[in-house]
Amino acid sequence: MVELRVNAGNVKNPNVHKIGIIALGSHLENHGPALPIDTDAKIASHIAFQASLESGAKFLGVIYPAHELKEINHGIHVSLEDLTDEIVKVLKSAKKFLRISSVIIVNGHGGNLPIVTTLYDIEERTGLLITLNSKIIESEGPHGGSGELSMAKALGIIDESQVENQTNLEEYGEVGLYMFGEARRNDPNIEEGALDVEENGVYVDDVYGQELLKLAINSVLLDVEKQLDSHYGY
């Protein structure tokens, strides 16, 4: 068998090759007229890929499906069970072919947050140690709001000619999750985001977008260090 040069390249710790980073977003979901339907997937993929470049960990790509709360209907999503099964399938394949022993899931879609309840099941079924990183969700603000618009500007995926229409909430009620009354009543954070968009509107700031992305990337890099320090599976 060929002996791999695990110390080759800009690699500070050869054990980083045993860590995988994979994006989890949403590919089929409305974000207002200024943002593409796969905004969450593209943002999560950028964060995961950049963290992979900077850390040396393996970039595993992106999970295709996404989950959403039943009271929020702004896209095409799957059940939590189906999402869990898909993650298990993908990670089993990555473990088999890439010899990883732990994974960081970079989550860029709030509707995926319930996956935290199935992480133990995913670990048991894959034999991998899993870290779920949702830093960007914690930082970006309302759905389709200034945070996502600014990151989209930094990534070059925004239609700036449509920003002025982003707060036409009668037509694009998914922005800020404004039109989802039940979700707003059930979750104070959703209600706060909806009111923020309604009362304050949105803006685009390239520097702010870059700062949000860097904050999220650094958070993933910290998770890589934690996995290395804990000697996960090594």
Swiss-Prot record:
Pathway: Cofactor biosynthesis; coenzyme F420 biosynthesis; Cofactor biosynthesis; riboflavin biosynthesis
Record has rRNA-binding as a keyword: no
Organism for this UniProt entry: Methanobrevibacter ruminantium (strain ATCC 35063 / DSM 1093 / JCM 13430 / OCM 146 / M1) (Methanobacterium ruminantium)
GO terms of biological process kind: F420-0 metabolic process; riboflavin biosynthetic process
Binding site for Fe cation 2: H31, D40
Residue ranges crossing the lipid bilayer per the database entry: none
Positions contributing to Fe cation 1 binding: E29, D40, H109
Name used for this protein in its record: 2-amino-5-formylamino-6-ribosylaminopyrimidin-4(3H)-one 5'-monophosphate deformylase
Keywords: Hydrolase, Iron, Metal-binding, Zinc
Gene (UniProt): arfB
Function: Catalyzes the hydrolysis of the formamide of 2-amino-5-formylamino-6-ribosylamino-4(3H)-pyrimidinone 5'-monophosphate (FAPy) to form 2,5-diamino-6-ribosylamino-4(3H)-pyrimidinone 5'-phosphate (APy).
